[in-house]
Amino acid sequence: MHLPGCAPAMADGSFSLAGHLLRSPGGSTSRLHSIEAILGFTKEDGILDTFPAERSSRSSKERDPRLGAQPACPKAPAGGSESSPPAAPGFVPEYEATRPCYPKEQGEARPSPGLSVGPAAGDSKLSEEEPPKKKHRRNRTTFTTYQLHELERAFEKSHYPDVYSREELAGKVNLPEVRVQVWFQNRRAKWRRQEKLEVSSMKLQDSPLLSFSRSPPSSALAPLGTGPGSGSGPPGSALPLEPWLGPPLPGGGATALQSLPGFGPPGQGLPASYTPPPPFLNSAPLGPGLQQLGPPPAYPCAPAFGDKFSLEEAYPRNSSIAALRLKAKEHIQAIGKPWQAL
């Protein structure tokens, strides 16, 4: 036995419309929600004919899980009264017709129409109670002249004062002990930097390259002929060269060399009993190989060092230094004058 309006409605697809009001056995009224009802379509539009009845009923059950527990066709109540007549097919509630349809994903909770979508009440309370924390910035301590004077005096006595000394000093200069401790730490760091700078500057001053590059004063070089009047360079040269690096001076060097000890003629300063050895290269017993070689070639030597006045007059107390410089001069000239290009 079929109830009127139940099986025919399911057959022609009109069972899924939103306007049907069903009365449950308990007497409460329930409303069916389907995709067509949410979108606002009716049977008269002609769109519902393309969907089968089973598909529309299955989609309505998926959208509203309450339909799964209800029977497809509710039974009539015990009193034998029939179900109330269905409402007009074209009647669609306004809130359902304007609400868009969003597909429900798995694990996603759809909010109820009566609840507002937004952050939870607990989160809003926490955000109101906990304002954003500001970064704590310590104010810089400004020391007075008296405080700096007392701190410097204490630093001269000891770079690492103990806690008792710091507390006593803090009470004396009216500062917290923590500020005094921080000041000593900064002062020790500054002292270490100063020590490193002093050590590095002393090493640079004592290096041989810098001592060699330093030129002697012009007053000491002028008697040796390196001044503008000696003809060794252009007048007014900014960087005078050392005496053994300059070009030789013309003429008159023999008298200056003979005045120094050890630079006299070959026979001077020798005892009377000394006899020079015979020249073995010119002797007869030499073999033919040595005779073909002949005497050794004479290396070109620069003209003798000369000056208008003797070195003893220029350096009355530094004759030994002048002699050493002259020996170095002759040694460089004998090598081949490599420094004259300078």
Curated annotation (Swiss-Prot):
Residues 136-195 bind DNA. Keywords: Developmental protein, DNA-binding, Homeobox, Nucleus, Transcription, Transcription regulation. Belongs to the paired homeobox family. Bicoid subfamily. A motif (Octapeptide motif) lies at residues 33-40. Plays a critical role in eye formation by regulating the initial specification of retinal cells and/or their subsequent proliferation. Binds to the photoreceptor conserved element-I (PCE-1/Ret 1) in the photoreceptor cell-specific arrestin promoter. GO terms for molecular function: DNA-binding transcription activator activity, RNA polymerase II-specific; RNA polymerase II cis-regulatory region sequence-specific DNA binding. One of its GO terms (cellular component) is nucleus. The gene is Rax. The keyword Transcription applies. It comes from the Eukaryota. Expressed in the photoreceptor and inner nuclear layers. A motif (OAR) lies at residues 319-332. One of its GO terms (biological process) is pattern specification process. It is found in: Nucleus. CDD domains: homeodomain. Residues 55-66 have a biased composition (Basic and acidic residues). It holds the Pfam family OAR. A motif (Nuclear localization signal) lies at residues 325-329. Residues 208-225, 235-244 have a biased composition (Low complexity). This is Retinal homeobox protein Rx. Residues 44-140, 208-295 are annotated as: Disordered.
